[in-house]
């Protein structure tokens, strides 16, 4: 059922469909489902906010973390905070009411904030992959990665994020309630007259999913080849072989994290776009959105907390200036000292 600035994925033959801006949507799912949605958003906030805020705080506290290669990690933390503050808090409030109680303006603001945070996070992973490839594989022999390059990378993420999220505010597509009608996103559902949804969805799918996917696979594929070649040249070195295994495991983890975050959402959005008019349950789009929003937790875990340098500084900050695991961390780093330069450049952080 399509109405002004909303789309409900069910027929209104019985006359029960109501505007998600004005009435609870309990006819879509049981009221308990909205409580589960609110609880899940609360879970993302209480875990996502501290770990991302701590990343920024620890970087301010420890000068050695303020290196050009870490700029993009800080940007990733900012993007996740944008999602947490601008998107998740709103969804908790609306799920308590069972509909998008904040109206059309609130839908635009929530859809813009959550999508912008997600897009900046996505492009941060792309820039991170490019930076690791450039530093480790050295495709440009005389190139030296510096602060200006790091700032350019961060700027690119915001430009691409805004290039994705601003058009729906000015008439190229639009933000509408989606899933259980308690949060807003891009209109993949309709071909509403005057919004050119078809061209926008194609642009979104190609420029903000396929291209990032290809770039990430290419960069990490080349990086793995470079690490394996280095390990093959030093077959006698146990530390090099261990470093290769660590890097391989980390790259696989990073790629899986990206796919878990964006593949379900992009696939379902594309299916809905190509099967417009067909009926589907409200959970059909809600569940993939859960995966995308969960990135505010597992992105910092993969890319920041698994970074030895960040982890040591975080523990030092949390334990008031002393890292209780310092001896273990030191022993671990000593074992891989011979390959520390390459592994630190490769690891997600």
Swiss-Prot record:
Matches recorded under InterPro entries: GPCR_opsins, GPCR_Rhodpsn, GPCR_Rhodpsn_7TM, Opsin, Retinal_BS, Rhodopsin, Rhodopsin_N
Keywords (A to Z) from UniProt: Cell projection, Chromophore, Disulfide bond, G-protein coupled receptor, Glycoprotein, Lipoprotein, Membrane, Palmitate, Phosphoprotein, Photoreceptor protein, Receptor, Retinal protein, Sensory transduction, Transducer, Transmembrane, Transmembrane helix, Vision
Cellular compartments per GO CC: membrane; photoreceptor disc membrane; plasma membrane
Disulfide bridges in this chain: 107-184
Sequence segments annotated as region (Disordered): 326-349
Low complexity composition bias: residue spans: 331-349
Membrane topology (Cytoplasmic): 59-70, 131-149, 222-249, 306-349
Gene3D superfamilies the UniProt entry points to: Rhodopsin 7-helix transmembrane proteins
Predominant cellular place of this UniProt entry's protein: membrane
Residues modified by glycosylation: 12, 197
Listed transmembrane segments: 34-58, 71-93, 108-130, 150-170, 200-221, 250-271, 284-305
GO molecular function terms noted in the UniProt entry: 11-cis retinal binding; G protein-coupled photoreceptor activity
Family: Belongs to the G-protein coupled receptor 1 family. Opsin subfamily.
PANTHER family linked: OPSIN
Functional note: Photoreceptor required for image-forming vision at low light intensity. While most salt water fish species use retinal as chromophore, most freshwater fish use 3-dehydroretinal, or a mixture of retinal and 3-dehydroretinal. Light-induced isomerization of 11-cis to all-trans retinal triggers a conformational change that activates signaling via G-proteins. Subsequent receptor phosphorylation mediates displacement of the bound G-protein alpha subunit by arrestin and terminates signaling.
Protein name: Rhodopsin
Name of the encoding gene: rho
């Amino acid at each position: 059922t399509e109405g002004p600035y909303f789309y409900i994925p069910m027929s209104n033959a019985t006359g029960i469909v109501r505007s998600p801006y004005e009435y609870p949507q309990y006819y879509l799912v049981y009221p308990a489902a909205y409580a589960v949605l609110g609880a899940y958003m609360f879970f993302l906030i209480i875990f996502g906010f501290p770990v991302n805020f701590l990343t920024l705080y620890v970087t301010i506290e420890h000068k050695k973390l303020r290196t050009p290669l870490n700029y993009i990690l800080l940007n990733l933390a900012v993007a996740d905070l944008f999602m947490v503050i601008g998107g998740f808090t709103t969804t908790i409030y609306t799920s308590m009411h069972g509909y998008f109680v904040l109206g059309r303006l609130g839908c635009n603001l929530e859809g813009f904030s959550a999508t912008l945070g997600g897009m900046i996070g996505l492009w941060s992973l792309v820039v991170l992959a490019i930076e690791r490839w450039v530093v480790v594989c050295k495709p440009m022999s005389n190139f030296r990665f510096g602060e200006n390059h790091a700032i350019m990378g961060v700027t690119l993420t915001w430009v691409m994020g805004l290039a994705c999220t601003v058009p729906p505010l000015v008439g190229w597509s639009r933000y509408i309630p989606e899933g259980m009608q308690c949060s807003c996103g891009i209109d993949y559902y309709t071909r509403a007259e005057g919004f050119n949804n078809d061209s926008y969805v194609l642009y979104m799918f190609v420029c903000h999913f396929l291209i990032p996917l290809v770039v990430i696979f290419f960069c990490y594929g080349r990086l793995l080849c470079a690490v394996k070649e280095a390990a093959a040249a030093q077959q006698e070195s146990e530390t090099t072989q261990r470093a290769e295994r660590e890097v391989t495991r980390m790259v696989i983890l990073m790629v899986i994290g990206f796919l878990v975050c964006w593949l379900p959402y992009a696939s379902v959005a594309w299916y809905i776009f190509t099967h417009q008019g067909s009926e589907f349950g409200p959970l059909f789009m809600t569940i993939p959105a859960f995966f995308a929003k969960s990135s505010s937790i597992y992105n910092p875990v993969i890319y920041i907390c698994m970074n030895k340098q960040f982890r040591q500084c975080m523990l030092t900050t949390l334990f008031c200036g002393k890292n209780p695991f310092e001896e273990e961390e030191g022993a671990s780093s000593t074992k891989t000292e011979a390959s520390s330069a390459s592994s630190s450049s490769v690891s997600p952080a």
